[in-house]
Amino acid sequence: MTIVEINHLQVTFAEKTAVSAAGFSVNAGETFSLIGESGCGKSTILRVIAGLQRDWHGQVSLFGHTIKPGMRFQGDLRRNVQMVFQDPYASLHPNHTLWRTLAEPLKIRGEREIEKRVQTALEQVGLPFDTARRYPHQLSGGQRQRVVIARALLLRPQLLLLDEPTSALDMSVQAEILNLLNQLKLEHQMTYLLVSHDADVIAHMSDRAALMSEGKIQRFFDRDAMEKGEHRMD
């Protein structure tokens, strides 16, 4: 099953073209990655798929449903597409306890057994339940990113968008988070779309990848090509 299909995607900011004629598909259960230097357009594509960037041209479908420019994600679509951002501290409200941050999306959807769901999500990312009583500044960078991943898991998404999920973390923590993501993907049968400029991260996580430069996809790589290092930009 094709989870994401993009054809001729174009995104322009003022007079600058951020994404030009991009096209690719992502199959259920795989990790597909976009690799490229900062500013090449890969995160913009992620924001289109997440419904955060609503001004674009082209064809985009998610789970077989056509997505239109300006469309607001609601219902199952909003639940099934979740995003983990680059900086975990910036994506957590500094004045809210982690309990409020984690419980709020469940309350909005009228979910039941909220405390149990939050506890399970924290345990799945290796954090004790009493972490929920704390504030973001009381956690390490790696712990904050685990909380962000837990928040994404709470709604049980089918597609997880990962925007440089380890680039703001110390090297010693990066491998832990990447291994956690791989483990969770298998346990929850999710599909990942990963953005990174790090060739090692791409090789560790990906089934397939695409190299971007100046808003365009230049080349695709399968697993064999990545094992040979053909995806490296240097």
Question: Where are these predicted regions, by residue range?
Answer:
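Conserved structural motif at the start of ABC-family nucleotide-binding domains
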Residues: 4, 19-21
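ABC ATPase NBD coupling module
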Residues: 66-82, 96, 100, 108, ...
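Conserved ABC ATPase signature
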Residues: 135-139, 143
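A short, proline-enriched helix->beta-strand linker immediately N-terminal to the Walker B motif
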Residues: 154-158
